[in-house]
Amino acid sequence: MASVSHTKPAKKSFRVGRVRAFLRGRVWYLCYHENGKRHQPRVGPDRQSASQMAAEINAQLEAGAPSALGFEPISIPDLRDRWLEHHEHVRRSSLQTISRYRAATQHLLDFVAQVRPLRRASDFRPVHGEEFVRYLRSKRVAPNGHAHARKRTLRDCGIRFILETCSTLFNYAQRHRHLPPYVENPFRTIEIGRIPIEDAKPVVAFTADQERRFLEACDDWQFPIFLTLVMTGLRPGELTHLLLPDDLDLVDGWLFVRNKPNLGWQIKTRNERDIPLLPELVDLLRFVLGDRRDGPVFRQRRCCGDYVPPLRGHTRRTLESEMTRRIPRADASAEGSERKLRHAAAKTLWRDLGAIKPDWVRKEFMGLTRAIGSPEVTAPKTLRHSFATSLQDANVDPLIRNELMGHSPGCVSGVGNTLGMTAVYTHTRPETKRRQLEGALRARPAAAIAKVWLAKRTFETRGPDDSPSAQANARQEASFCVARPVGEARSPNSPMTFEARAGKADLRVSAEHNGVPGSPAAT
């Protein structure tokens, strides 16, 4: 009679301390709780490997350390969505910043979808990061984002920004335990900071001659706008969102850069500041504004004619009420869309106020730089660079420079700041700020050109002031400005000069009639 085998079947589960292992089909899984959350990671078909992993995780749980498998696997597209939502709802980053982050991380999503398919963010290794850099260097993109624009390869600074953004994305994944514990950020091994920038556009600051030719090329609508940028260092968005009467004091000569959250606009750094105005700029703004006491300081070109903005005459309070009325009720389930709806409503509000779009400032700037033979200069922030350079040339105190530029918080807390607590305890008096700014800008031709421009417009409006003192001042001011003859060859698309528009033969002719401007009629 044959013997019968009584071998016991292998157990399908076992426990090691706080960790239970069980067999499902042919694969071993672990089950344990960490920080109140249940984890059930897959180990593999080998029972011995499952036993070793269970013992390792149990030791980590007993020691209070993060478990080796205690992370939440997530795909890279889902990780990116969570990260952007974190910036939207938790960090409250600006919509422009979120848009830039979305565009930068889209390159990573394209890489994962087209070149290296990876199921999870935890599968992205340093070798994939290096492959991603090679992919970026070979990719051709439209520099302005338009589908039909000529494409070119990414610049080094663009590649660095994309890599820094993706590195920040994986830092978020580490903090929220979407990567295995003790696994390094795959972008950290690339050493992004050591990637050289070899093809960056040079940073340009206008020379005195370029500044003179640039301002002389402006028409009557452009001149007050760009003179203000030259003499205050404002960002274009700050200039286009100045409101009367709160942001401009022509009696004491101050310009106030203020956040306007209830009107859908805030300063880039959220840092408000006060900027003293030179007397020449005060006189010019008084002439341009006339008796207008509301609306944007600088209005659209069509407002110089018969166009009347729909919201003309509204006060700050009524504008805020109008803003609230224009925001449609956001769906309760679509919390993230509220800011976008508010942003869209703000754009229409400022348009109906007659405000200039910041992009229009850039278009006008590019037209002027083409007219003076510098088509490669395309960014209005060139004027901001020139302003900062003028402060440096005049040895303006670094703290005052930071305040005038709106960089004070970054100076106090920035890396490499040598002033330390001195910057915190230093409070600049308004008269000190005004004195140093005037000393810096007096060396530039802008103030003298402003006087000549205002003298011409005043002469055209009221007639000349023939007093000896006025004529002496006119000769002194005109000596700073080298006039361009009317018959000089010009580009057919370039703006007309002062003398051509006024019908004068030479800029100095009208400068002879320079008087002290009074309270002119509204323009």
Predicted region positions:
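N-terminal DNA-binding module of tyrosine recombinases/phage integrases
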Residues: F22-D123, V127, Y307-H343, H427, ...
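Basic/aromatic DNA-contact patch characteristic of tyrosine site-specific recombinases
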Residues: M1-P77, D81, H89-V90, S99, ...
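C-terminal secondary-structure termini that scaffold catalytic or DNA-interacting sites
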Residues: M1, D252, N262-W265, E272, ...
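N-terminal core-binding DNA-recognition domain of tyrosine site-specific recombinases/integrases
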Residues: R42-D46, L84-N171, R351-W360, E376-T382, ...
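Basic, Lys/Arg- and aromatic-enriched nucleic-acid-binding interface segment
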Residues: G145-H146, K151-D156, R160-E164, R175, ...
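Short, charged phosphate-coordinating catalytic segments
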Residues: N171-N185, L229-W254, P398-E403, A483
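C-terminal catalytic core of tyrosine-transesterase DNA break-rejoin enzymes
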Residues: R175, D220-L227, M231-E238, A371, ...
